[in-house]
Amino acid sequence: MARISGIDIPREKRVEVALTYIYGIGLTRAQAILEKSGVNPDIRVKDLDDGDIQKLRAVTEEFTLEGDLRRQEGMALKRLQDIGCVRGRRHRMSLPVRGQRTRTNARTRRGARKTVAGRKK
C-alpha cells in the first residue's frame, strides 16, 4: 500500500478515488493534486512507481490534512463556544446552528425523542 499523509491508500482503486480516503481531500482536490503532480488519474495505486508517489506526497504536503485539519476545526468550534456567540451556544447545546427550525424536525441534531407524560384533563 502507498502511504501518503500518514494514511495507507487502497492499492486496487484508481489514484483519483484512493486519494479521497485521506481526510481533507475530496474528488475535486484529488483531481487538482493529480493535475499539479502530473500523475495519470486513471492509473491504479498498485501501478504507481516510487517517483509518482513522491510527487503526490510533495503536493499533498501543501494542504492541511488529517489530524492537523481535525485539530483546526475543533479549535474553531471551541473558539466560537468560548466567546459565547450564538453559533457557539448552539453547538454546545447540540442544536442546529444555521437557523433551522427546531419545534419540529431537527431530529438528527437533537437526538431521539424524550417521552413526556400526558396531562390529565
UniProtKB/Swiss-Prot annotation:
Keywords: Ribonucleoprotein, Ribosomal protein, RNA-binding, rRNA-binding, tRNA-binding. This is Small ribosomal subunit protein uS13. The keyword tRNA-binding applies. One of its GO terms (biological process) is translation. One of its GO terms (molecular function) is structural constituent of ribosome. One of its GO terms (cellular component) is cytosol. Belongs to the universal ribosomal protein uS13 family. It comes from the Bacteria. NCBIfam families: uS13_bact. The keyword rRNA-binding applies. Transmembrane segments: none annotated. Located at the top of the head of the 30S subunit, it contacts several helices of the 16S rRNA. In the 70S ribosome it contacts the 23S rRNA (bridge B1a) and protein L5 of the 50S subunit (bridge B1b), connecting the 2 subunits; these bridges are implicated in subunit movement. Contacts the tRNAs in the A and P-sites.
